[in-house]
Amino acid sequence: IPLMAMPDAVDALLTLASAPRDRLRRTAYNVAAFNPSADEIRAVVLDAFPQAQITWKIDSKRQAIVDSWPSDVDDGAARHDWQFQPRYDFERAFSEYLIPTIRKRYA
C-alpha cells in the first residue's frame, strides 16, 4: 500500500495550505512517496536490527480491506498544482527517519 514518512505528510499539508488558490484545480489531492511490500520492509528492518524476529499472520478480514484499496495513488495533480515532492523515498524513510527514531526511543 502507498506509504510516506510523517515529515512528508506534514510538509504536504503545510504546502497545500499555503498554495495560492488560483493554482489549485481541485479540492482534494492524493500524495504518496513509496509502495513497499511486507518482504521489502522486513529486509530493511532485519538489516538494521539483525536480532529482530519478524513474523506475521494474515487476518482475512483486514486483508480484504487492504485488498479493496488501490495498489498505488496518482499524485500527479499535487506535484503539478503545488509542487508536492516527498523528501523521503523508501530507503531514506527507513535509514534517515524510521530506524534512527526507533533506535533513539529504545536505546
Where do the language-model regions lie?
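C-terminal substrate-binding subdomain of Rossmann-fold SDR/epimerase-dehydratase oxidoreductases
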Residues: P2-A107
